[in-house]
């Protein structure tokens, strides 16, 4: 049996990939990619994640762009507003943002899917490479998939 989604194919013989999809027990490594200022649900998600020490080792938070409403008229402004909101939330729960919160891309990836440089992108790549099949990095992306 195979699973298809937009050209991506996984067969039951792809045990490495399928094993990565299985729920893990214990502490998992994760980063959060979020357009926190866009809507309030991301703020709740960020705080819940930070308070879930017994299950999630949060290794970073990345500000994602947004521009779909009156809060931001372009992706860069949306990302900056989200970055500032992340800092405010962490301050309220007494968590340092140093080497933990990173600014994301200033524009959307778009249909060309070209690489856009940003501190969040570099940090995400670094953290992913630190992982392994036994200890993967989970990327919780609740904003635009641009970082």
Regions found by a protein language model. Name each.
Residues 1-147:
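N-terminal acidic, glycine/proline-rich low-complexity segments
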